């Protein structure tokens, strides 16, 4: 009998796949447990439609992430800091501070998705990599300038 998996099943397949299984396995275990349903022509058509709709949603989401990447890469974040000897700032600029600054500008980026190439301890220009998901990474320019006064 042909079935459509409603959940991932070990040693059989993943959710949404169509498989041929023994009648007893399908009727006595998979269907009663809610792991599968009988694969009728209508059910298979419905499954394909759902998969196409999901693929369109994923493509649209990925396109939004690409646009976000472009916006972030066109931006420069500037921090002012008190400076001591040798242009060394007091403290460091952290990923949390970067995330807050991006949030103030309307971007919802988690600090754990921001990776600094090096610790920001001196006045100057730095870059940070931001993992946006879907295998897309944005590079953010960061500038640290001395506090005036």
UniProtKB/Swiss-Prot annotation:
Transmembrane segments: none annotated. PROSITE patterns: RIBOSOMAL_L9. Keywords: Ribonucleoprotein, Ribosomal protein, RNA-binding, rRNA-binding. Pfam families: Ribosomal_L9_C (PF03948), Ribosomal_L9_N (PF01281). GO terms for biological process: translation. It comes from the Bacteria. One of its GO terms (cellular component) is ribosome. InterPro entries: Ribosomal_bL9, Ribosomal_bL9/RNase_H1_N, Ribosomal_bL9_bac/chp, Ribosomal_bL9_C, Ribosomal_bL9_C_sf, Ribosomal_bL9_N, Ribosomal_bL9_N_sf. One of its GO terms (molecular function) is rRNA binding. HAMAP family: Ribosomal_bL9. NCBIfam families: L9 (TIGR00158). Binds to the 23S rRNA. Belongs to the bacterial ribosomal protein bL9 family. This is Large ribosomal subunit protein bL9.
């Amino acid at each position: 009998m042909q079935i459509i998996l409603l959940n991932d099943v070990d040693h059989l397949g993943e959710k949404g796949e169509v498989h041929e299984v023994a009648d007893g396995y399908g009727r006595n275990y998979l269907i009663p447990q809610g792991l599968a349903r009988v694969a009728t022509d209508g059910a298979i058509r419905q499954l394909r439609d759902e998969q196409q709709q999901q693929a369109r949603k994923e493509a649209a989401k990925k396109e939004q992430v690409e646009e976000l990447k472009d916006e972030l890469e066109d931006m420069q974040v500037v921090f002012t800091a008190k400076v001591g000897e040798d242009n060394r700032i007091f403290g460091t600029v952290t990923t949390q501070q970067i995330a807050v600054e991006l949030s103030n500008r309307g971007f919802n980026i988690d600090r754990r998705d921001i990776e600094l190439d090096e610790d920001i301890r001196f006045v100057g220009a730095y870059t940070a990599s931001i993992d946006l998901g879907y295998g897309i990474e944005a590079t953010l320019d960061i500038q640290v300038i001395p506090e005036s006064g």
